[in-house]
């Protein structure tokens, strides 16, 4: 199976970890079309109906932080399974539903969520995706 960084951190540190998710309804993103491909500025499609991102968009707020402590109404409300979009270093809008959406109970996945309704792509500091010689930085999970 696949594990995300949040699952690994929660497994290692339990309730000492605070997991924060990020969502967006639309905008632009810097991502590649395939592993090892060059970074591109891509338009992010509007979120699918009945997704977490669509629900947050319907609030009419441009951006917000949603805290979900154990006894909060938000945590209870977000127990319902919803589609959630994951955009990382790869973004494939042409297969977005299959490539980037999954079913989740958001309040089981995160302790808080930052929603930015419309994002703007970041510009890469280094405009190449080629490997460079040298030792790879440790990133699992202690090196994060």
Residue ranges of each PLM-predicted region?
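C-terminal regions of proteins
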Residues: 1-144
């Amino acid at each position: 199976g696949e594990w995300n960084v949040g699952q690994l951190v929660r497994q290692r540190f339990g309730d000492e970890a605070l997991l924060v998710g990020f969502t967006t309804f639309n905008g632009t993103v810097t991502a590649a079309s395939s592993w090892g491909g060059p970074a591109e500025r891509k338009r992010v499609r509007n979120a699918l109906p009945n997704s977490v991102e669509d629900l947050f968009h319907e609030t009419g707020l441009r951006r917000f932080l949603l805290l979900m402590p154990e006894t909060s109404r938000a945590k209870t409300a977000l127990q319902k399974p919803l589609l959630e979009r994951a955009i990382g270093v790869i973004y494939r809008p042409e297969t977005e539903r299959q490539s980037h959406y999954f079913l989740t109970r958001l309040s089981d996945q995160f302790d808080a969520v930052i929603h930015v309704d419309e994002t703007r792509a970041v510009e890469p500091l280094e405009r190449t995706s080629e490997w460079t010689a040298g030792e790879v930085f440790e990133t699992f999970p202690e090196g994060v």
